[in-house]
Amino acid sequence: MAWRITLGLFISLLLSFAALADVGVGFQQITIVKGADNRPLDVAVFYPVSSSSQTTIIGENAAFPGITVSKNAAPESGKYPLIVVSHGYGGSWLNQLWLAEALVKQGYIVAAPNHPGTTTKDMRTEKAQELWLRPHDISRVVTALLAAPEKTGRVDEKRIAAVGHSLGGWTVLELAGGRFSAAQFEQDCLTHAGLASCKVYERMQVAKNAASRTQLDKSLADPRIRAVVSLDMGLARGITAQSLAAINIPVLIMAAGYPNEELPAALESHDLARKLPPAHSTYKEIADATHFSFMQRCKPGAIDIINAESPGDGMICLDGGERSREQIHQDVAQDISEFLRAAWRKP
């Protein structure tokens, strides 16, 4: 009987996702100012709307394509699961537009904040060094959207997840219950000084006094987060094995498999994944994905355009095989969707 009920729920979910195949993508930008952190958050929110809503394109420029959205459109009725996306160091909510679009079309609300101090147009060291506030940013977004269903749709409070790329991967693992140890990480960097994580950590000037080390070493878990997905995370070697073993929500760890001496899967994502409880964790390495394959697609000629503005940064358009980035994105989005559907079925 239990099996039949589970199968029935699964079929129901599949039908509901299929029914949303032609749904439009609503879009709003909000600012969250409440809080004691003096840390206003710029947040992009994407949500299901009627496919007949008026549309425009956002996120497009000479280097990157955008997506089609309906700005400030009224949300569809009903409850929807919420996914909050955390960008990497120096990134922004634009980096995972492709994922937001794919998830909204499957019936999710997706929210993505710009993290102060580590986002494209705000790289202030004094904000970046408050690394422990990154997970809190995600929690603030959850609180804000739960409190205002009339704006972007009603959130199903039992189906809330977080997805993070690079430093965002560290952010969501902290929300799941991972505990960072500044002492452990700094000791490890003496052995692995060439890792990008060690370089970024030093650039952010993290944990330079006792007070900040105490804040960073605290638990930053949010029990409202019921599942997390990490996309080629950094700073993994600072999360304690004891805290990883105690995580009791579903975790999907995805890694770029294309060789990268500065962010090797073997020392970052895979090393972390083997410390998670196998009963509710999944690890997948994508052989032809680079670290930047999880970011937005690039237009033809984008490498030259980006290099002209910022020499060397055109590398963000490079993938590791014959597949296009769009094909990689399709597979990643499918993996995430399947993982989340399974996570929602767990008691």
Where are these regions (language model features)?
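Alpha/beta-hydrolase active-site loop
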Residues: 127-153, 157, 170, 174, ...
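Catalytic nucleophile-loop/oxyanion-hole region of alpha/beta-hydrolase
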Residues: 90-102, 119-140
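The conserved beta1-alpha1 loop
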Residues: 81-88, 232, 255-256
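Short beta-strand immediately N-terminal to the catalytic nucleophile in serine-hydrolase-like folds
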Residues: 162-164
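Short beta-strand/loop motif that positions the catalytic acidic residue
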Residues: 247, 253-255
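C-terminal catalytic-base region of ester-bond hydrolases, centering on the histidine
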Residues: 261-347
